[in-house]
Amino acid sequence: MLKLQVLIPNQFLHQFSRSSTNKLFFIQSFTTLGNLYSKMSVEEEKQKFLKMSLEEKRNHYQINATTIDQIMSWKDYWLKNKAAISRNNVDDPEKVDGALASKVSMWQGDITSLEIDAIVNAANSSLMGGGGVDGAIHRAAGPSLKKECATLGGCQVGEAKITGGYHLPARYIIHTVGPQGEKPDKLRECYENSLGLAMKNDLRTIAFPCISTGVYGYPQKSAAKIALATVKKCLEENEDKIDRVIFCLFLKSDKDIYEELLQKYFAFE
């Protein structure tokens, strides 16, 4: 690890002891140096994990990993299960080609287990961890995640920020803060900014939890419509930049909603 050593000449120490102004200057200087050292240490730790081979990093996982090959695309899921899937509530399906339908998945499981490029954290504005999926991600990633988050200056509703994944199977975590209550524009921004950050960093596989539908009170079906419509628009405009978007679902009610709405937004037969 990089070590920082500061040598202070005797004449500066003498000035420091005599002047309150100089005291303030030195305190501010050392605080700045300390913050710089802290950021350098965080970056060093992040890069250590990012540069590991897959085999080496697997030794650091806190959970059994799920690979992208273990998750069916919506196209494959539909072809396998369409005889058993209800079509009663599907209005005005929006046709897409099979290639686009292969770029989305719905999956019930633990988002912290996904061995992909990035998982999205439904964070709070401090980025310092909380309950639900936020707390689960922080626990699985380890304490280095909180140290990096402390350098980011928080996050506003609808914005997104990126950190390393540390002990997670995912290489990166994209943190976004969902709205409290039903605010469609802000929820849409969460998905748009998260996808934009993924593409900016050449991350081709990404998983979303259901943002804002828990204690933040956004109705599940309304939130799912925004998620699917926003992801569909992004894929249509950037089909060559994203390989898979996974909607990670925890509740059976979420699975039922996505199974219904995927027939509308990603219909291909």
Set out the residue ranges of the language-model regions:
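Macrodomain-like recognition of ADP-ribose-binding/processing modules
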Residues: 2-269
